[in-house]
């Protein structure tokens, strides 16, 4: 007798899709909760809610962004089809801004730019994770596909501008408190505001690379190709 076939739910492909679906669902729920919380708070308290955005939803945002690092592992081991470098750049942007710039400086946490950043990030992620979650189980909607491949075009550059503004606003506090600045032997030192200024320039270089990749991906998914003339 030949080997018995495994039940569908035990097959590797099914387990991979089930895992990805659960992962995308968890991320979608997390980002939806954040966005809903911010919306309700804004309509309840107005501009005052923007000042304490980080205190209200910062923990959940940090949790969602930390878990999103798993996506690099997904791509590396091959269970998620994507390019590693562009995704790495997108994730490190957020990790640096959220954990290094915002979390480490309490004064920055009260800035309006934090609320703006969180709105942009969550808008993109709610659409992206919805699209990915449904794609895993073979469900596709033309409107959702178009939205997931188009929404980032105006919002991603705005995200980068907001991230750059957050860095700019944080510089005086890093200079005053000396956070992450380190004195090294042999009269050397690491002055962290200089590191942030260098990263500020790299942020826009990375934006160009990521934007080019996302546009190429959009063209492939939506099937927008140049029309070739037929030879007579």
UniProtKB/Swiss-Prot annotation:
Pfam families listed in its UniProt record: PTPLA
Recorded superkingdom: Eukaryota
Membrane topology, as annotated: Multi-pass membrane protein
InterPro entries according to UniProt: Tyr_Pase-like_PTPLA
Biological or metabolic pathway of the protein: Lipid metabolism; fatty acid biosynthesis
Catalytic residues in the record: 156, 163
Quaternary state and interactors: May interact with enzymes of the ELO family (including ELOVL1); with those enzymes that mediate condensation, the first of the four steps of the reaction cycle responsible for fatty acids elongation, may be part of a larger fatty acids elongase complex.
Functional description taken from the UniProt entry: Catalyzes the third of the four reactions of the long-chain fatty acids elongation cycle. This endoplasmic reticulum-bound enzymatic process, allows the addition of two carbons to the chain of long- and very long-chain fatty acids/VLCFAs per cycle. This enzyme catalyzes the dehydration of the 3-hydroxyacyl-CoA intermediate into trans-2,3-enoyl-CoA, within each cycle of fatty acid elongation. Thereby, it participates in the production of VLCFAs of different chain lengths that are involved in multiple biological processes as precursors of membrane lipids and lipid mediators.
Protein name: Very-long-chain (3R)-3-hydroxyacyl-CoA dehydratase 4
């Amino acid at each position: 007798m030949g080997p018995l076939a495994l039940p569908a739910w035990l097959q590797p492909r099914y387990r991979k899709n089930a895992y990805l679906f659960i992962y995308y669902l968890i991320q979608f729920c997390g980002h939806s909760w954040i966005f809903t919380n911010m919306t309700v708070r804004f309509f309840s308290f107005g501009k005052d809610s923007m000042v304490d955005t980080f205190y209200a939803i910062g923990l959940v945002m940090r949790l969602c962004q930390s878990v999103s690092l798993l996506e690099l592992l997904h791509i590396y081991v091959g269970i998620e089809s994507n390019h590693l470098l562009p995704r790495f750049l997108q994730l490190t942007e957020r990790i640096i801004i959220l954990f290094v710039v915002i979390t480490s400086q309490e004064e920055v946490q009260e800035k309006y730019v934090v609320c703006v950043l969180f709105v942009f990030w969550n808008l993109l992620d709610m659409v992206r994770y919805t699209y990915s979650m449904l794609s895993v189980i073979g469900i596709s909607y033309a409107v959702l596909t178009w939205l997931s491949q188009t929404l980032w075009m105006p919002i991603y550059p705005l995200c980068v501008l907001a991230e750059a503004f957050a860095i700019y606003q944080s510089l005086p506090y890093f200079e005053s408190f000396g956070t992450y600045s380190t004195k090294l032997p042999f009269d050397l030192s690491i002055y962290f505001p200089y590191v942030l200024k260098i990263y500020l320039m790299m942020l826009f270089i990375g934006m160009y690379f990521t934007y080019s990749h996302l546009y190429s991906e959009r063209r492939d998914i939506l099937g927008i190709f140049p029309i070739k003339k037929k030879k007579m």
